[in-house]
Each structure stands twice: as structure tokens, then as C-alpha cells.
Amino acid sequence: MGESFYTRTTEAPSSAFDLSLRPPAFSEFCGQEKIKDRLMLMVEAARQRDDVLDHILLSGPPGLGKTTLANIIANAVGCRIHTTSGPQIEKAGDLAGVLTNLEKGDILFIDEIHRLHPAIEEYLYPAMEDFRLDIIIDQGPNARSIQLNLPKFTLVGATTRAGMLTSPLRSRFGLVNRLDYYTREELCAIIERSAGLLNVPVDPEGALQIALRSRGTPRVANSLLRWVRDYAQVRGDGVITEQLAHDALTMIEIDDDGLDEMDKRLLEAMIYKFNGGPVGLSSLAVAVGEDASTLEDVHEPFLIMQGYISRTPRGRVAMPSAYLKMGAAPPANGQGWLL
């Protein structure tokens, strides 16, 4: 296999397929119940006051529904949503162009907000607090500041790395929520809903097979469903059963535990090349031929969650379950596990 399925799925922007399955309302959004309750309360309170929502920060791993929730909030409020991302706002003029296009009550959604340049953040602070934009015209002794009043708006920021947000920016959000991985039952419900929208019959056991390999992530679940649907159409009778789902996912080298080829290469490198660790992330990235940030964002969270590896102050360490998974004998002294 070439590029990891999970890398393609979690790092790629939302496709037309993803958008077609996106729930439009809180009532159709499965999972994240506590966050949904908070957001629905905020929306109702703002509606009763006839005011705009406070600024909201959504953090968590990719594919858990941050963008979907931002759109649901806009639908619930009945306002427009303007979408951009941190890397797209390269200079103050880019931010000014976005902010001056807003109308009262609009939502500005900034994905990857942790990637905003610190200089851009300085312009964002008065916009968030006082709905004011201060622009510096000219340079040197001729420099002067022009103040533009902005309509009251809501900033919804999304980040996969909340720790990279500066403290001043983080403190300006009225509500900060971290999305968690989804349970097996929640993923089954999402898969069955998506299958219904796609007019694909799926057995409960077939949905479970897909859910078990979805890494707690709806975007992965829907991408796997898309592949299994195609497999069922060509190799089966169109119905997604337990056996058919198993065969379809085995074909793309995703095993019963949800590990793909890159996951196994990562574990093999830790065990056989680095004697179980501890090993640094950059060394691992070179050993498996993958970008370090991809390993950290896409593969490590699942492997840590499943108990295959652990992070220690000295580096990554392969845990006993990793040796068992790869059919290797654990070191007798259990090196690294207690570091």
C-alpha cells in the first residue's frame, strides 16, 4: 500500500462526500453530548437576549466534528458563516478583508487557528473584545492608525493543538470545548445514519465491523463506509454484512484492531530498530519514511489510546501489547516502560 489510509482521511480537507453526510442540526449530531448541551444553551440564551453568541473555541484531534459543529451553530442561530483558516490569513490585510465583510450576528470560523501569526493575533484581539479593527497606514514618521468599527460577530476557532494557542488569544474565548473520541456505539449510530443517506443496507454487525476500525473518529468511519459500500456493490449483493465489511477492510490492509500498514511499520521500527525505545519522534519519522507531524497527529494518538506505545520524558516506548501484536518477545527487563 502507498500512503496510509488514516493519513489520507484525517489530513485531507472535507470532500463533497463528507459534506453530503454532515448533520445540519444538533438533533442529528451524534456524540459529544456535553458539548452539544453547552452550545444549545448558549444559542438559546443569545436568542432570548437578542444578542450575538460569545466567541467559541473547539479543540481536539482531526475528524471529530469541529467544522460540523461550527456550521450547526450557524444554522441554529440563523446566520451566515464565513470560513477561513490560520494559514490563509498571512497579513493584516487578509484579516481586514474577512472582518469587514461580516454582518451583525455572523459567524467567522477560523480552522487551524493555532497557526495564526502572532502579529495577526494582535489585530484580532480588539476585533474580538471591542468589535474594532485598528489598521496602521504607512510606515515610519508618516504612520497613522485608522480605526474601523465592526458589526458584532462570533468567532469560532478550531484547533488540533490547543497547547500552541497563545494565552492572550485563548483567554478571549468565552467557551472552550475539547472534543473527545467517539464510543463504539456512537460510531455505529453515525455509520447507520450515513448508510441511510447513501441508500446502502447495513447490518448492525456490519456497522460494528466498520466502527471498530474507525479510531473513534466519524470522518474515518464515513470514509471506511464509502469503501465498504463500493466493495459490497462489486463483490457482494450491495448489503454490508459482518463478513463483507471484514473482507473489504482487510483488502485495504486495516486489521481487526484498526491498525493500518503505517501503524505496523511504526511499531516494527520501535521494536526491531530501536529495541523498544525510548526513541525520539524525529528518529521514528526517518525510520518509517513519514512526516513527524503526521505521526504525532494521526498515528500516535490511536496507538497511545490502545496501549501500544507510551510517551516518556526520554521518548516513545513500545508497550507489552505492541510486542504481542507484532509477535515479538518483550524484553526481559521491561526497559523504558516505567521511564
From Swiss-Prot:
Keywords: ATP-binding, Cytoplasm, DNA damage, DNA recombination, DNA repair, DNA-binding, Hydrolase, Nucleotide-binding. SMART domains: AAA (SM00382). It is found in: Cytoplasm. DNA binds at R311, R316. Residues 1-182 are annotated as: Large ATPase domain (RuvB-L). Belongs to the RuvB family. Has 3 domains, the large (RuvB-L) and small ATPase (RuvB-S) domains and the C-terminal head (RuvB-H) domain. The head domain binds DNA, while the ATPase domains jointly bind ATP, ADP or are empty depending on the state of the subunit in the translocation cycle. During a single DNA translocation step the structure of each domain remains the same, but their relative positions change. This is Holliday junction branch migration complex subunit RuvB. It comes from Akkermansia muciniphila (strain ATCC BAA-835 / DSM 22959 / JCM 33894 / BCRC 81048 / CCUG 64013 / CIP 107961 / Muc).
